[in-house]
């Protein structure tokens, strides 16, 4: 996600009718990253933050300046980050795991009595390495080039380079007691992969994605407890291949969705509902590898693009991608309620019908996905996913105990996933010496939930426990294909937190937290053709501390310390693609392991203006 973490003020999770405003990709809900709200009139603030991590030498910094003078508002932020290769107990330093990141954001706007108009300009530049996990057969160690310095902040081959530009115009107007919002956005994302030592400035994969987003919706004033909202939103996209290697075809896409939601408050009961219609049209272009008989000869990297439509009869093996058009449409809806059973005890229920159109990677991939050791193949016959989901939420709060329970049951038709291919001898299919995976679909049932409890017998002491579980089953399949791939393992997180000083003269909000992060063994995996393997359980011990430092009654700085994976446990997360890289022939262990012990320090300094 091309987002500067330092710019995120809060994170919101939307489910139920409210998520209908966000289109087909919001089938399971919406995760919204909110930036900081604009300041009050006459206020100006600045701050500087910096941090360091010992495991991979990660150094980051961020400078922010915001203000509001007579309704003219601004918010400027510049952030940077760099890290060398991380290390763990089994692999040592992991070649290709270094990164560099830069981000610049500028908000300019005007707040007035009838609403606001804000223009946000963002630039994000990420240069991550690519972990290939190739090993020396004799020693079992990860292969590294001669003269490689594991603590270098440079860019060892291979690596990616991502440039992301974004402009968003956010308008809001009050119409009586109602509200009209118009949002227009443009994004340009260019992703390049560099892998040739002989030609370090020439990239293999190079594609550029243009996206235009639009959103217009109206929220009515409350009338006898009723609220209505209606609108239209969608996007236009164009993707262009500029390199000599390819993963997905060039394409353009247009979609739109119209929606309406309603809510009603009746005493302690809140009712809500909504409906949405989505339509998406995708036009994927052909790409043909040039041969001597081609009349459209080109010296451009040995390839020529053909954007014309074809019925497929004249296509032959020289075509990397075949042109096709697909249209998808679906109707979604949701009904929900929230009821205050007791002043401290609430219940939420929601039933939703979901829809998701397959994306271009799932439909038309045909190339090596670097860093995953996969040759990915799309499937143009895929159908949209359709689902029914039921959610139940309970929450209770008292001076001593706070508890939440969230359960869900999801039935998805045509659930899309990728499967490793095997030949008639049950041996992996290799394309360009890389295992081949193809997108397919099936009917799925997904059950799960999360339970959390926080016990605070005294104000300063907290005992927290959270347990999450997901069971995802593919219906009417053999035992090897029963469980869906990339299902997270059951997880239990337990912590104890104590605040030593509250409103102290020198130290304020001083706290220490000890945490145990226990990930249970995942035996529910997609075993067909060895697409996945079981993942052993592991437990991580972490420690966190923080305080505000004050001088003459004013906050001078905030200091945060942490130690993660204190026991230096070697582990692999079940969702990590790195666990399927090369086998260590000496130890028999497969893949690359996650980061080992890591200590962090972070300082945030407010600047008075």
Where are these regions (language model features)?
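N-terminal periplasmic accessory domains that precede
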Residues: 1-3, 13, 25-49, 61-63
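Transmembrane beta-strands of outer-membrane beta-barrel pores
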Residues: 50-56, 69, 80-84, 112-114, ...
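Transmembrane beta-barrel wall of Gram-negative outer-membrane proteins
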Residues: 56-82, 92-131, 159-176, 222-223, ...
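Flexible loop and strand-edge segments within Gram-negative outer membrane beta-barrel domains
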Residues: 83-85, 95-97, 101, 115-176, ...
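Outer membrane beta-barrel strand-and-loop segments of large Gram-negative receptors
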Residues: 202-217, 377-383, 389, 398, ...
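Structural signature of Gram-negative outer-membrane beta-barrels, strongest in the C-terminal barrel
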Residues: 223-229, 233-235, 243-412
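C-terminal beta-signal and adjacent terminal beta-strands/loops
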Residues: 356, 411-414, 418, 518-525, ...
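Gram-negative outer-membrane beta-barrel transporters
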Residues: 408-411, 429-522
């Amino acid at each position: 996600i091309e987002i500067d973490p330092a710019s995120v003020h809060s994170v919101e999770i939307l489910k139920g009718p409210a998520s209908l405003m966000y289109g087909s990709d919001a089938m399971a809900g919406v995760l919204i990253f909110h930036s900081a709200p604009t300041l009050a009139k006459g206020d100006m603030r600045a701050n500087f933050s910096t941090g360091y991590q010992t495991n991979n030498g990660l150094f980051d910094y961020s400078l922010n300046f915001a203000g509001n003078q007579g309704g003219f508002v601004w918010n400027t932020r510049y952030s940077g980050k760099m890290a060398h290769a991380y290390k763990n107990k089994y692999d040592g330093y992991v070649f290709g795991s270094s990164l560099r990141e830069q981000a610049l954001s500028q908000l300019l706007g005007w707040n007035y009595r009838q609403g606001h108009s804000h223009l946000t300009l963002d630039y994000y530049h990420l240069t991550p390495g690519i972990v290939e996990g190739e090993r020396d057969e004799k020693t079992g160690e990860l292969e590294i080039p001669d003269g490689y310095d594991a603590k270098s902040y440079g860019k060892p081959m291979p690596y990616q380079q991502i440039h992301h530009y974004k402009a968003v115009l956010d308008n809001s107007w009050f119409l009586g007691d109602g509200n009209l919002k118009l949002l227009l956005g443009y994004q340009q994302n260019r992703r390049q992969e560099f892998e040739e030592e002989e030609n370090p400035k020439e990239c293999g994969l190079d594609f550029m994605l243009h996206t235009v987003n639009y959103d217009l919706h109206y929220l009515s004033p409350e009338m006898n407890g009723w609220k209505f909202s209606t609108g239209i939103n969608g996007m236009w996209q164009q993707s262009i291949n500029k390199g000599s290697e390819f993963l997905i075809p060039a394409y353009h896409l247009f979609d739109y969705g119209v929606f309406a939601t309603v809510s009603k408050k009746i005493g302690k009961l809140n009712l809500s509902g909504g409906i949405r219609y989505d339509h998406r049209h995708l036009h994927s272009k052909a790409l043909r590898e040039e041969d001597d008989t081609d009349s459209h000869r080109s010296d451009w990297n040995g390839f020529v693009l053909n954007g014309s439509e074809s019925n497929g009869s004249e296509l032959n093996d020289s075509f990397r991608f075949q042109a096709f058009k697909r249209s998808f449409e679906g109707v979604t809806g949701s009904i929900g309620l929230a009821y205050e059973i007791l002043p401290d005890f609430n219940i939420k229920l929601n039933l939703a019908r979901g829809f998701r159109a397959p994306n271009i990677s799932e439909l038309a991939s045909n190339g090596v996905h670097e860093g995953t050791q996969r040759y990915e193949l799309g499937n143009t016959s895929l159908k949209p996913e359709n689902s029914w989901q039921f959610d139940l939420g309970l929450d209770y709060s008292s001076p001593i105990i706070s508890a939440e329970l969230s359960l869900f049951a999801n039935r998805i038709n045509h659930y899309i996933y990728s499967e490793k291919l095997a030949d008639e001898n049950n041996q992996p299919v290799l394309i360009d010496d890389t295992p081949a995976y193809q997108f397919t679909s099936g009917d799925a049932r997904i059950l799960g939930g999360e339970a959390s409890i926080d016990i605070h017998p005294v104000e300063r002491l907290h005992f927290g426990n959270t347990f999450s579980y997901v069971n995802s089953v593919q219906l009417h399949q053999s035992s090897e294909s029963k469980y869906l791939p990339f299902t997270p393992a059951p997880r239990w997180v337990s912590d104890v937190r104590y605040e030593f000083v509250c409103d102290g003269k020198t130290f304020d909000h001083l706290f220490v937290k000890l945490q145990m992060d226990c990930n249970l063994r995942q035996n529910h995996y997609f075993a067909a053709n060895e697409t996945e393997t079981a993942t052993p359980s592991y437990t991580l011990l972490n420690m966190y501390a923080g305080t505000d430092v004050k001088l003459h009654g004013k906050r001078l700085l905030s200091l945060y310390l942490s130690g993660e994976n204190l026991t230096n446990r070697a582990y692999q997360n079940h969702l990590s693609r790195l666990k399927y890289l090369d086998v260590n022939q000496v130890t028999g262990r497969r893949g690359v392991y996650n980061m080992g012990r890591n200590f962090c320090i972070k300082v945030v300094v407010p600047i008075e203006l």
